[in-house]
Amino acid sequence: MTTLMVQGTTSDAGKSTLVTALCRWLARQGVAVAPFKPQNMALNSAVTADGGEIGRAQAVQAQACGLAPHTDMNPVLLKPDSDTGAQVIVHGRAVACMDAAAYHDYKRVAREAVLASHRRLAERYRVVMVEGAGSPAEINLRANDIANMGFAEAVDCPVILVADIDKGGVFAHLVGTLALLSASEQARVEGFVINRFRGDIALLEPGLDWLETHTGKPVLGVLPYLHDLHLEAEDAIDDRQPAKTGERLKVAVAVPPRISNHTDFDPLRLHPQVDLVFVGPGQRIPPADLIVLPGSKSVRSDLAFLREQGWEAAIRRHLRYGGKLLGICGGLQMLGGRIADPLGLEGAPGESRGLGLLDIDTVLEAEKQLRNVRGRLALEGAPVSGYEIHAGVSRGAGLDRPALGLDDGRCDGALSEDGQVLGTYLHGLFESPAACDALLRWAGLREVASPDYHALRERDIERLADLVEAHLDGARLRALCGLSG
């Protein structure tokens, strides 16, 4: 078994993308490979086969390996619930909400969870491909580090350092990061990968020669900028859209500060018949066919934010004119009459008045619901699959008109009597083409043909592996993975 780690000089240097690419590159060679990220901080998560949750980037990397996501692939997940605190999830289950100081003290416990998960993966797979977090050169985070060099030192693995040249300063990033590492950590860095290069490689070669001479480390390759790559973004919302023509549905997503699982909207962003707009602070909700209230990690505070922005009035005006309104997870809870948080799971204990558009009330409970589900929409009976991640339990007469019937015998969500408002706990519902078709027809699109989102993601993973094959030093990479030839 070999462990190889990818670390980055900055956030968004390309760590997730490179790990995804290397996982598929190895899997295409018949190598049993698994992804691993010791500690992730993200509000976008995926439900695993063993009933927990991990960062969505690791779920995509699992797909690149041909595996079902497992909690061991991301043993520690931090989901921010305020500017200074986060819900701490270990082995797929929430253990506590902590501020930064409390989590720093907890890191020794988290470290054991990380090492236990790594050991289990190492016993099952030929290669464990590890993704670091942020940068290994953050001086203030070095103590008890479990995300970057602290992990690499603990398991004694080599490291590839990746940097993004598109933003500029790539040589300063690489040399500066290396200089801030200890001698033993510097020795772990086996080479560099430069990401997102545009232009004539011949003009870059003198700089590469200098970098190798100055550091004594090889450049393992230069990856070109890949246009129209649409793998799920882990942090910032990706609002890039391909050029679109013909009849299109206007969809507006109201974005609160603690939005979660904004990847729900990637299929709409890429849909050729949808104009998608994300509405942020200080912006008015534009005229739209469909308004969506997304998931939230802090539903009551995000509902207050919605009202502060004047969006409640805009939503009611939208409905008066016949528009459609969809609430997903936390958005469903906002549509009801009342949201109660007696345990203070998402802030101070208390309750808030909802929008009153569905006849339901929600109470947040300690045990989070985590499951992958299949079923059929009330709209056209369209088949749908997705996942649930929520602490709230909703009750009320509105549930007598469910939005979905699930294969496990349960019903989910609610559809208003006038058919204008639909709420569901199901994330990922736009990824099912038939369900996406039905929802867009409900919202007013007459002729619709939704693309296969899973096929689009698979295509992009293959494109990444092709880049590794064409532009990186395959022999050196195989040697770093402990593979011959």
UniProtKB/Swiss-Prot annotation:
Active site feature: C329, H427
Coiled-coil ranges from the UniProt annotation: none
Keyword field: Cobalamin biosynthesis, Glutamine amidotransferase
Keyword Ligase: no
One GO MF term attached to the UniProt entry: ABC-type vitamin B12 transporter activity
SUPFAM superfamilies: Class I glutamine amidotransferase-like, P-loop containing nucleoside triphosphate hydrolases
Domain GATase cobBQ-type as annotated: residue spans: 248-435
Pathway terms, separated by semicolons: Cofactor biosynthesis; adenosylcobalamin biosynthesis
PROSITE patterns in alphabetical order: GATASE_COBBQ
GO biological process: cobalamin biosynthetic process
Stored Gene3D superfamilies: 3.40.50.880, P-loop containing nucleotide triphosphate hydrolases (3.40.50.300)
Entry's family note: Belongs to the CobB/CobQ family. CobQ subfamily.
Function per UniProt: Catalyzes amidations at positions B, D, E, and G on adenosylcobyrinic A,C-diamide. NH(2) groups are provided by glutamine, and one molecule of ATP is hydrogenolyzed for each amidation.
Name this polypeptide is given: Cobyric acid synthase
This protein's encoding gene: cobQ
